Amino acid sequence: MRALRLVTSESVTEGHPDKLADRISDAILDALIAQDKKARVAAETLVTTGLVFVAGEITTEGYVDIPNLVRKTVREVGYTRAKYGFDADTCAVLTAIDEQSPDIAGGVNLSYEWRVLKSTDPLDRVGAGDQGLMFGYATDETPELMPLPITLAHRLTMRLAEVRKTGLLPYLRPDGKAQVTVVYEGDKPLYVKTVVVSAQHSPEVEQEQLREDLIREVVRQAIPPEYLKDGETEYLINPSGRFILGGPHADTGLTGRKIIVDTYGGAVPHGGGAFSGKDPTKVDRSASYYARYMAKNIVAAGLARRALVELAYAIGKARPVSLRVETFGTGVLPDEKLTEIAKKVFDPRPLAIIEELDLLRPIYTPTSAYGHFGRPGFPWEETDRVEALRREAGL
């Protein structure tokens, strides 16, 4: 028997203050990119008691009524009553928006390859919006080709929001969190060791009723029964006790503070760049999406059971300064060979990514909660490079 290990991941609901900030930032991005595909957007949001503050750098021919859009977004999430301590109709909305730095714009609009190397390749024209490293990952332990702990954590928070919105558990409020610890034997997930659910609620509900309801209607609906082991799985439901004050009234929220929730739950490294509120010339976002696309196709093609793709960029330069594939000993070919195959099949230049994944569309608000990866409907989740990868691998 191989040694057992524990892997833990967390998720938060759309009503968590950091996620509310992410959603507002992405709503602004979507509203602008729907009008102006060339919009350059870096929208940052802070939410606290009675206040939303939106700042950032935006260059666009479009126009968005930011205060009205903020209120609409807050209302959609569910902060609609003053007793929640944060209300869409009464919160103040402040803005401080500048244009994108002309120095940055110059390097993005006309890349190092065009300016210095005199390239005439159209896909070389747009440079990366910043330096940095980005990671994409896929694993065959779930149908979504995502790590099991983060997949289950997202299912819990999505279910928590669902039972609130449908009125099945009418005493729930928008804020909430979940955490899942999974027992692994080697790379194989065996069962869930610990489930943590913290749900904001009205003062009237008793803790015992809350516990029973959340185990029955949330945990057992979200986690497949084969992963819940009698006598082994521990259920920690609101382990701190009462959770009446929540959302921005209890904790200040900021865009970009849930980067591990947004990605792979800590299963692999993270380059540090956040996603929400950024247009796709920002490789923090678009290259992370493309790295996931690459990794998922490698696993879907049967070239590895686990694949990590690392990309790195220099600001103003179109071509990555590095590209690496790592398969943790699960690849059918050496990692060096898979890296060479990936370079032939994929094109991670910013403009190529934008065109291939069709990223100049208002598709970003749904990504702002419950993870950017492992959900259908996003172009970076497609597996349309499988045949090309298998051909290059000689399979």
UniProtKB/Swiss-Prot annotation:
What PANTHER family does UniProt report for this protein, alphabetically?
S-ADENOSYLMETHIONINE SYNTHETASE
Query: What is the protein's species of origin?
Result: Thermus thermophilus (strain ATCC BAA-163 / DSM 7039 / HB27)
Q: Which cofactor does it need?
A: Mg(2+); K(+)
Keywords assigned: ATP-binding, Cytoplasm, Magnesium, Metal-binding, Nucleotide-binding, One-carbon metabolism, Potassium, Transferase
GO BP term, example: one-carbon metabolic process
State how it assembles.
Homotetramer; dimer of dimers.
At which positions is Mg(2+) bound? D18
Q: Which Pfam family is one of those matched by this entry? A: S-AdoMet_synt_N
Q: What is its main location?
A: cytoplasm
Explain how, and how many, cofactor molecules are bound. Binds 2 divalent ions per subunit.
Organism superkingdom:
Bacteria
InterPro entries, per database record: ADOMET_SYNTHASE_CS, S-AdoMet_synt_C, S-AdoMet_synt_central, S-AdoMet_synt_N, S-AdoMet_synthetase, S-AdoMet_synthetase_sfam
Nucleotidyltransferase as a keyword? no
Pathway(s) annotated for this protein in UniProt = Amino-acid biosynthesis; S-adenosyl-L-methionine biosynthesis; S-adenosyl-L-methionine from L-methionine: step 1/1
State the reactions this protein catalyses: L-methionine + ATP + H2O = S-adenosyl-L-methionine + phosphate + diphosphate
Location of this chain's protein in the cell: Cytoplasm
- Write out the ranges of the annotated region (Flexible loop): 100-110
Q: Which residues bind ATP?
A: H16, D175, G176, K177, R242, F243, D251, R257, K258, A274, K278
E.C. no: 2.5.1.6
Instruction: Indicate what this protein is called per its UniProt record.
Output: S-adenosylmethionine synthase
Q: Which GO terms describe its cellular component?
A: cytoplasm
- Give the matching PROSITE patterns: ADOMET_SYNTHASE_1 (PS00376), ADOMET_SYNTHASE_2 (PS00377)
**Is Transferase among the key words of this record?**
yes
Query: Where, by residue number, does K(+) bind?
Result: E44
Give the protein's function. Answer: Catalyzes the formation of S-adenosylmethionine (AdoMet) from methionine and ATP. The overall synthetic reaction is composed of two sequential steps, AdoMet formation and the subsequent tripolyphosphate hydrolysis which occurs prior to release of AdoMet from the enzyme.
GO MF terms here are:
ATP binding; magnesium ion binding; methionine adenosyltransferase activity
Ligand binding (L-methionine) = E57, Q100, D251, K282
